[in-house]
Amino acid sequence: MAKTHEIKAERRADEGKGASRRLRHAGVIPAIVYGGELEPVSIQLNHEQIWLAQQNEWFYSSILDLNLNGDVQQVLLRDIQRHPFKQLIMHIDFQRVSANQKLSAAVPLHFINEEASPAGKSSEVVVTHELNEVQVVCLPKDLPEFIEVDLGALEVGNVIHLSEIKLPAGVEIPELKLGKERDVAVVAAKHVRIQEEDAAGEEGSEGAETK
């Protein structure tokens, strides 16, 4: 199980746009926590703490310990709304998780040993990461903070598919149960010449369609 991280919160008494605006001016983020067998609860968070937390990968993919006035609930971040141009978080949604109920979450992929691989050592090869995260299903205790993809043996022309990712125990990729066409490429190592030919072919197709 990935390490959990504590987020402090307080119950929010006032609701509505006016109340939310006042909270933001005071350096507080309006938020909500829902799910499980409990009713949704309007809460508020310290903007400075959350601003620092949201700069870390774990904030988006880990089980969080939401400390709500001393009552600790395990939650996942489900939505974060940001101001379009200010360094300001507008609202956050958390979902409670149950220890015995599987959850769905997006987990980041960490690519390792790429530079040491045959493909990575070649100046004539472009290694493309087609996916940077993957949707998984598992129990909360099994949720990984990230999944490593070892590229140490990557050769020129190789393609690593979703089904080839080594998953931690108890973790599944639901997309793979929906058919072979869902077994998409995660990493591709192409010779630069082939990469350029593919790009030229796509541009030609687009030009033909616009005529």
From Swiss-Prot:
* Top-rank lineage group of the source organism: Bacteria
Indicate whether Transmembrane appears among the record's keywords: no
* Residue ranges with Basic and acidic residues bias: 1-18
Its keywords, alphabetically, are: Ribonucleoprotein, Ribosomal protein, RNA-binding, rRNA-binding
- Region annotation (Disordered) maps to 1-20
Query: Would you name any one GO CC term?
Result: cytosolic large ribosomal subunit
Cross-referenced InterPro entries, in alphabetical order? Rbsml_bL25/Gln-tRNA_synth_N, Ribosomal_bL25/Gln-tRNA_synth, Ribosomal_bL25_b-dom, Ribosomal_bL25_C, Ribosomal_bL25_long, Ribosomal_bL25_short, Ribosomal_L25_dom, Ribosomal_uL5_bac-type
What does the record give under GO molecular function?
5S rRNA binding; structural constituent of ribosome
Gene Ontology annotations of biological process type: translation
Task: Tell me which family the UniProt entry assigns to this protein.
Answer: Belongs to the bacterial ribosomal protein bL25 family. CTC subfamily.
**Function summary:** This is one of the proteins that binds to the 5S RNA in the ribosome where it forms part of the central protuberance.
PANTHER family noted in UniProt: RIBOSOMAL PROTEIN L25/GLN-TRNA SYNTHETASE, ANTI-CODON-BINDING DOMAIN-CONTAINING PROTEIN (PTHR33284), RIBOSOMAL PROTEIN L25_GLN-TRNA SYNTHETASE, ANTI-CODON-BINDING DOMAIN-CONTAINING PROTEIN (PTHR33284:SF1)
- Name the UniProt record assigns to this protein: Large ribosomal subunit protein bL25
